[in-house]
Amino acid sequence: VNDAILHAIFADGCAAAVISGEKPGSQKAKGKFGIVDTHGWLMEGTEDGITLSINENGISCILSKYLPQYIAKNMGGYVESFLGMHNLQKSDMDFWAIHPGGRRIIEEAQNGLGLSEEQAKYSWNVLSNYGNMLSPSVMFVLELILNDHKKALAKGERGLKQGLAFSFSPGVGAEGVLIKVM
């Protein structure tokens, strides 16, 4: 039954990224994302939140009904700690790429981080138009963000400077990427 529910709530999607060693400020890097830092964090006491196992039918995933609460409770501290390593605060972020793992996942990430609906609009857009595609979902969010940045620049407006992308892994883990727009 669990696998049938999971197949019903997950969508299909594919994403790829080209990562290069272009120097910030170079013409090739302009208008693209630069990875400043990455950080993985395991939320204490959430081992039942997302569990994966391999069986004769393939990969099986079990999601705890408490997963959204784990995210709400833990994301604020995780993000503050990660940004603090770079002398940054949430208010310094121009964009947020929240893994669109479902309505409750986005809502509770917003609640835990004190973000508005507007700040999570890209994640809501991807969830609404594509659903939760698991791993590639946050890449779709980043594509929307980069497209909006390029549109703003084309109109002579200030583009985006920096933001944070994150998704969730078994454990429950949070995997974050601090991004600068070149």
PLM features: residue spans?
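Condensing-enzyme catalytic core mediating Claisen C-C bond formation in acyl metabolism
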Residues: 1-73, 77-81, 168, 177-182
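Claisen-condensing/thiolase-fold acyl-transfer catalytic domains that form or cleave C-C bonds
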Residues: 72, 76, 90, 94-182
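Long hydrophobic segments that form regular secondary structure
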Residues: 83, 88-91
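Amphipathic, alpha-helical segments enriched in basic
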Residues: 50, 54-58, 63, 84, ...
